[in-house]
C-alpha cells in the first residue's frame, strides 16, 4: 500500500524532516509513506491569494494519478480516533489504491482539491502549524498500523 502526503510548503526545519522520517521509516515495506512537497507561492502585500491557492491546488492535483484516492485534511473534516484511523487504513489497504493525504498552505486547500476528496479528515478543531501537521500525520499513520498489527506501541 502506498500513502503519500502531498503538502504545500518546502524547506522545513530539520526537526520537522527528522520527525517525519522517523515515523515513515518505522512502517513496514508493504506500507510506504512518502512526502511530496509543493512549493508555497510567495505572498506579497498585494498578492492575489485566491489565485495563489488555486495554483497550489493545481500543483497538488497534478501529483495525483487517475483512480487514486484523495483524502483532504480540513478543520471541518471528520475527526477520527486512533481506532477509527486504523479501520480507515485497513480499508485503504484492501482497496489497493494509492492514498493521497492533502495538506494545504496557510490559507488552506484550493476548492478544486476539496471537490475531488473522497474523504475529509480533521486532526483537530485547533489551528495547527503545518510543519507539525506533517509529524502528526506520520505518527498517527504509524500508530494506526501498530493497532492493526497488534504492536505494543499503542496502549
From Swiss-Prot:
Its EC number is 2.1.1.177. GO terms for cellular component: cytoplasm. SUPFAM superfamilies: alpha/beta knot. Coiled coil: none annotated. GO terms for molecular function: rRNA (pseudouridine-N3-)-methyltransferase activity. InterPro entries: Alpha/beta_knot_MTases, RlmH-like, tRNA_m1G_MTases_N. It is found in: Cytoplasm. Gene3D superfamilies: 3.40.1280.10. Its main location: cytoplasm. The keyword Oxidoreductase does not apply. It catalyses: pseudouridine(1915) in 23S rRNA + S-adenosyl-L-methionine = N(3)-methylpseudouridine(1915) in 23S rRNA + S-adenosyl-L-homocysteine + H(+). Keywords: Cytoplasm, Methyltransferase, rRNA processing, S-adenosyl-L-methionine, Transferase. Homodimer. Belongs to the RNA methyltransferase RlmH family. Specifically methylates the pseudouridine at position 1915 (m3Psi1915) in 23S rRNA. This is Ribosomal RNA large subunit methyltransferase H. It comes from Pseudomonas putida (strain GB-1).
